[in-house]
Amino acid sequence: MFCASSSPITSPLYPKAYKFSQTKSNSKRFSSLRASLPVSDNKLLKFEYTPWLIVGLGNPGLKYYGTRHNIGFEMIDHIARATDISMNTIQSKALVGIGSVGEVPILLVKPQGYMNFSGESVGPLAAYYQIPLRHILMIYDDMGLSNGVLRLQPKGGHSQHNGLKNVTEHLNGCRGYPRLSIGIGNPPGNMDMKAFLLQKFSPLERKQMDEGLEQGVEGVKTLVEEGFSDSISRFNLGQKYKFHKV
């Protein structure tokens, strides 16, 4: 089921329906979000900009650091560095950083429950900050794409990804939220899928992935400022063919 982005969204933990309001008088939480930004940025921000909730999926703890299944966390770290956002707040079982891309407020999120319970952070945060479905960007690992290849989409299914499944459940079954898929390739031979997901990258894979993450930062910044414009179409096309030799 795809839910219209203009419809109110509810969360099982925050059952009251909500709809993001762009007026100052009706958005106290957005006011506090804006106030938490650096003073120099506050002078530039305008209330017509709807904030983005940008969530990277992964598992907490050093055991999972640098593994394929945690690439969503790595993408959030790259975005945080590029935008000078400190991931220094704990809210709704998640590590949260608040800042902006240009004039657009963003919240960077790394759920600290395990992957399969990511929705327990996403649902409450979306409800609390009144983020519309179309501005909830999920970042996750995708075995359907080659290692280091990225793709931005306005909506889609869960692709058998348990983290996405749980997020969708906590957004009332609505799948119409944007997502950034980060390719990690497929397990070689008869390798167990779980073992593959929890394995670290080879040196070549790591190089490809690091380049992809840097490109992903630019893709996310473009999405936040322009939406799903022609620039995103060009981004996806460039990603699709970047390893093809002419």
Swiss-Prot record:
Active site, per annotation: H69
Keywords: Chloroplast, mRNA processing, mRNA splicing, Plastid, Ribonucleoprotein, RNA-binding, Transit peptide, tRNA-binding
GO biological process: mRNA processing; RNA splicing
GO cellular component terms, A-Z: chloroplast stroma; ribonucleoprotein complex
Disulfide bond positions: none
SUPFAM superfamilies listed in its UniProt record: Peptidyl-tRNA hydrolase-like
Record-annotated site: Stabilizes the basic form of H active site to accept a proton: D141
Pfam families associated with the record: Pept_tRNA_hydro
UniProt subcellular location: Plastid, Chloroplast stroma
List of residues binding tRNA: Y64, Y114, N116, N162
FT transit peptide: 1-34
Molecular-function annotations in GO: peptidyl-tRNA hydrolase activity; tRNA binding
Purpose: Required for the splicing of group IIB introns in chloroplasts.
NCBIfam families: pth
PANTHER family the UniProt entry points to: CHLOROPLASTIC GROUP IIB INTRON SPLICING FACILITATOR CRS2-A, CHLOROPLASTIC (PTHR17224:SF7), PEPTIDYL-TRNA HYDROLASE (PTHR17224)
Summary of subunit composition and partner proteins: Part of large ribonucleo-protein complexes that include group IIB introns and either CAF1 or CAF2.
Family the entry assigns: Belongs to the PTH family. CRS2 subfamily.
Entry protein name: Chloroplastic group IIB intron splicing facilitator CRS2-A, chloroplastic
Species in which this protein is naturally found: Arabidopsis thaliana (Mouse-ear cress)
Gene label: CRS2A
